[in-house]
Amino acid sequence: RELLASIDRRTTVGRRDYAILLMLARLGLRSSEVVFLELDDIDWDAGQLSVHTKGGQRIELPLPADVGEAIAAYLQHGRPKSASRRVFLRARAGITGFRGPSSLGCVVRRALQRASIDAPTTGAHQFRYGLATQMLSHGASLTEIGEVLGHRHPQTTMIYTRVDIKALRALALPWPGGVR
């Protein structure tokens, strides 16, 4: 929340970065899925996105209102004119889509620096992990989390179930006679 609140949405780059970061946080998309998203992949009438996944599949995802509004604000008031069909474009000369997924890591790092957030990891994948962790803590099943993240195999989703020792300590009952 702090990160998103720190973005200056009055600027072209701010509108773009806000929409990108919101997509990462709310939908748990991979960097490549955001980078290669094209204008025709957004069905505004149905309120959904058609996403090309890592495994070459195409999945339909609901477009949350806040994400849709952020994308629309960028498209209407920030996206430079370009022949590129990619939704998100670089802001520098030679206006094209991002070169690849690692470019979003730069967007995330810059946003973290501007917000003065010292994060242990600074890549775009932290948003995906954060969404999975949040879903898990709210009682979602591994199957549900896997569906949202586009995992084909349950083993892949298991990566997101790492034990949070601090959280467990806060929930644990004290051992009789022991110190907490």
Where are the predicted features?
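Conserved catalytic core of the tyrosine transesterase superfamily
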Residues: R1-R180
